[in-house]
C-alpha cells in the first residue's frame, strides 16, 4: 500500500513542502529565518486572538482594557508582552531574512522576492495599526503624525486623511477601524506567505554559493527540520528572556500615559523597527518629498533584480560588494539611531547624509562595484 503521505490530496501538499522537499545541501543558518518568521506569525496570531477577547476598541475604554488584561486576566501580562515583543522579534527576523536575500542574490527569484516586499509592507502596516490600539500618548500622536503624511498627496490628500480618520481628527472611528484592520491583516499575510512559498518551491531554494544546486539536493526532513527546531528554540529563548526580564525595554514610556489630544509629547517617535524609515522621512524638509522618500526606502527593494549587474549571483566571492553591503548595514544602523534622536544639530545633518548614502549605495555604488568586479575577474 502506497504511503498516505504521498497520495492524500492535502497531506501530499504538506509532504512536498516540508518533508520530501529537495533542498540544497549547503544552506547555512541564514536560511533559518523563513521558518522563524512563520513561527513569529503564528505566535502573533495566537496571542493577538487572546488579546482581542479582552480588548475594547473604544477611546474611553481601550487604555483601561489593556490595563485590565495585564492586571486581571490570567497570564494576561504574559500574552500582552509576548505580543508586543513578538513584533520586535518578527522585525529582527524580517530584516535578517531580507539582508540574507540581498547578500546571496535571492532576489533573482523575482516573483518570490516581490511578494516578499509586499509582505514587508503588509507587516509594517499591521504593526503600525497595532501600535495605535493601546491608546496611549505615543499611540495617538503616532497615528496622527503618520496618517497626516497622506495629506501630502496632491489634490485628494486632505479628503483622504479625513476619510481614513472617519472624522476631523484621530478619534473613536479611527481606533475602531484600526482594530478591525489589525485583526484581518495577519490572515491576509498568512495567505500571502503561502503564495510566497508556492513561488519559492517553483524554483527551489538559493544557496550561499549562488550556483545551481540541482545535482546535490537532500530531503528537507530530517536535515532541515532538525535545523529549524534549533532556530525555533533559540528564538523562543530570546523572546521569553525579553518578555520575562525586561518587557518594556523596547517600548516607549509615553505609551503608559493615556492618549490626550491636548498635550503633545516632546518627542514623537515610532517603535525601533520603523526608526530607519522615520529618519529618512524627517531628513527631507519638504512634506511630499519626505513621504516619497519614506515609501521608496522600502519600495527600492523591488529594484534589486534590475540593478544586479554582477556575473555572479551571490556576494560570497565578491569582496568589494561585501564591503558595500556591510556599509549599507552600518548606514541602516545609523538611520535607526538618528530616527530616535531629537530634530536638532548635529542629528539633522547626520540623518540627511545617512539618507543620501542609503540611496546612493543601492542605486549607484553597488551596481558600479559589481561591474568593476566583473572586470577584475575577467568575466
Swiss-Prot record:
Q: Which PROSITE patterns match?
A: CYTB_CTER, CYTB_NTER
Listed under GO cellular component are:
mitochondrial inner membrane; respiratory chain complex III
| Co-factor(s) | heme b
- Its principal location? mitochondrion
Q: Which UniProt keywords apply?
A: Electron transport, Heme, Iron, Membrane, Metal-binding, Mitochondrion, Mitochondrion inner membrane, Respiratory chain, Transmembrane, Transmembrane helix, Transport, Ubiquinone
Q: Which cysteines are joined by disulfide bonds?
A: none
The UniProt record gives the binding positions of heme b b566 as 97, 196
Can you cite a GO biological process for this protein?
mitochondrial electron transport, ubiquinol to cytochrome c
Kindly state what the record says about how the cofactor is bound.
Answer: Binds 2 heme b groups non-covalently.
Q: Which GO terms describe its molecular function?
A: metal ion binding; ubiquinol-cytochrome-c reductase activity
Binding of heme b b562, residues: 83, 182
Question: Where does the sequence pass through the membrane?
Answer: 33-53, 77-98, 113-133, 178-198, 226-246, 288-308, 320-340, 347-367
Spell out the InterPro entries in the cross-references.
Answer: Cyt_b/b6_C (IPR005798), Cyt_b/b6_C_sf (IPR036150), Cyt_b/b6_N (IPR005797), Cytb/b6-like_sf (IPR027387), Cytochrome_b (IPR030689), Cytochrome_b_C_euk/bac (IPR048260), Cytochrome_b_N_euk/bac (IPR048259), Di-haem_cyt_TM (IPR016174)
Report the protein's function: Component of the ubiquinol-cytochrome c reductase complex (complex III or cytochrome b-c1 complex) that is part of the mitochondrial respiratory chain. The b-c1 complex mediates electron transfer from ubiquinol to cytochrome c. Contributes to the generation of a proton gradient across the mitochondrial membrane that is then used for ATP synthesis.
Stated family: Belongs to the cytochrome b family.
State whether it acts alone or in a complex, and with which partners, per the record: The cytochrome bc1 complex contains 11 subunits: 3 respiratory subunits (MT-CYB, CYC1 and UQCRFS1), 2 core proteins (UQCRC1 and UQCRC2) and 6 low-molecular weight proteins (UQCRH/QCR6, UQCRB/QCR7, UQCRQ/QCR8, UQCR10/QCR9, UQCR11/QCR10 and a cleavage product of UQCRFS1). This cytochrome bc1 complex then forms a dimer.
Q: What else is known?
A: Heme 1 (or BL or b562) is low-potential and absorbs at about 562 nm, and heme 2 (or BH or b566) is high-potential and absorbs at about 566 nm.
What's the protein called, per UniProt?
A: Cytochrome b
Which organism is this entry from?
A: Callospermophilus saturatus
Q: What is the lineage of its organism?
A: Eukaryota, Metazoa, Chordata, Craniata, Vertebrata
Encoded by which gene?
A: MT-CYB
Amino acid at each position: 500500500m502506497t504511503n498516505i503521505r504521498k497520495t492524500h490530496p492535502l497531506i501530499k501538499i504538506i509532504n512536498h513542502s516540508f518533508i520530501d522537499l529537495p533542498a540544497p545541501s549547503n544552506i547555512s543558518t541564514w536560511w533559518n529565518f523563513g521558518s522563524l518568521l512563520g513561527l513569529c506569525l503564528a505566535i502573533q496570531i495566537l496571542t493577538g486572538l487572546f488579546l482581542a477577547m479582552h480588548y475594547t476598541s473604544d477611546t474611553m475604554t481601550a487604555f483601561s482594557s489593556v490595563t485590565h488584561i495585564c492586571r486581571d486576566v490570567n497570564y494576561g501580562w504574559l500574552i500582552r508582552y509576548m505580543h508586543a515583543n513578538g513584533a520586535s522579534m518578527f522585525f529582527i527576523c524580517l530584516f535578517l531574512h531580507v539582508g540574507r536575500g540581498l547578500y546571496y542574490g535571492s532576489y533573482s527569484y523575482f516573483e518570490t522576492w516581490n511578494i516578499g516586499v509586499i509582505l514587508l509592507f503588509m507587516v509594517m502596516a499591521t504593526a503600525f495599526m497595532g501600535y495605535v490600539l493601546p491608546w496611549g500618548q505615543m499611540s495617538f500622536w503616532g497615528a496622527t503624525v503618520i496618517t497626516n503624511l497622506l495629506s501630502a498627496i496632491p489634490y485628494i490628500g486632505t479628503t483622504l486623511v479625513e476619510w481614513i480618520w472617519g472624522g476631523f481628527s484621530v478619534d473613536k472611528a479611527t481606533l475602531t477601524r484600526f482594530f478591525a484592520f489589525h485583526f484581518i491583516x495577519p490572515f491576509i499575510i498568512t495567505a500571502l506567505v503561502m503564495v510566497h512559498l508556492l513561488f519559492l518551491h517553483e524554483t527551489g531554494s538559493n544557496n550561499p554559493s549562488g550556483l545551481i544546486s540541482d545535482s546535490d539536493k537532500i530531503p528537507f526532513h530530517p536535515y532541515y527540520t532538525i535545523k529549524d527546531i534549533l532556530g525555533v528554540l533559540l528564538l523562543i529563548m530570546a523572546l521569553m528572556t525579553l518578555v520575562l526580564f525586561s518587557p518594556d525595554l523596547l517600548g516607549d514610556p509615553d505609551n503608559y500615559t493615556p492618549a490626550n489630544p491636548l498635550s503633545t509629547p516632546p518627542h514623537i517617535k515610532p517603535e525601533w523597527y520603523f526608526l530607519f524609515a522615520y529618519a529618512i522621512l524627517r531628513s527631507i524638509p519638504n512634506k511630499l518629498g519626505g513621504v516619497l522618500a519614506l515609501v521608496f526606502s522600502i519600495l527600492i527593494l523591488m529594484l534589486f533584480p534590475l540593478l544586479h549587474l554582477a556575473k555572479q549571483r551571490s556576494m560570497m566571492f565578491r569582496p568589494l560588494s561585501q564591503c558595500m553591503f556591510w556599509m549599507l548595514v552600518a548606514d541602516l544602523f545609523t538611520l535607526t539611531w538618528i530616527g530616535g534622536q531629537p530634530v536638532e544639530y548635529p542629528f539633522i545633518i547626520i540623518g540627511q547624509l545617512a539618507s543620501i548614502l542609503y540611496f546612493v549605495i543601492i542605486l549607484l555604488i553597488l551596481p558600479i562595484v559589481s561591474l568593476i568586479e566583473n572586470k577584475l575577474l575577467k568575466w
